[in-house]
């Protein structure tokens, strides 16, 4: 993409990443669903959402509900075996060295975002929180759903909090729910 040269272009200071199929080479909800024995059902709901039959929020609620009863130890096993996108470790080392603030803004789950944060040193993680009771997923989530609009809102809030002009931000993602964030970032 061509961009107008200027001081803001040369001094990017915040970079926000999607997680699933961006920092990692999988969709965590599919991994969880396969372990819960509901992989086909979850993929069917995802396809309905992609066809526009249901929106992201509704598809999210339906897919999370199918995870009810899954033991949290499965999440730990999936986390330590996540297929990391090639170059993430080197990229994070360089971004930290040059002073970037880094964030994961994901429609996935905080458990896995926090794993990547501790492994690679991300500054922030915003994702969806799965509700757990007695060591099992309840099939519910807590807090606000992180969808495309929420990602854009979080990017704005991080820029304000870090006192960074939004033109000095970068957003990286792979899907339709990343478009709002990509559209408002200085580079997306």
State what each model feature region is.
Residues 74-188:
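C-terminal cap/substrate-recognition subdomain and adjoining C-terminal extension
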Residues 12-29, 182:
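Asp-based phosphoryl-transfer active-site loop
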Residues 26-27, 58, 111, 153:
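A generic alpha-helix surface/boundary motif
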Residues 1-17:
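Non-catalytic pre-domain segments flanking phosphatase-related domains
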Residues 7, 33, 123:
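Active-site phosphate-binding/coordination module
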Residues 19-20, 51, 134:
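Residue-level recognition of short loop/turn positions
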Residues 28-97:
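A metal-dependent, Asp-based hydrolase signature
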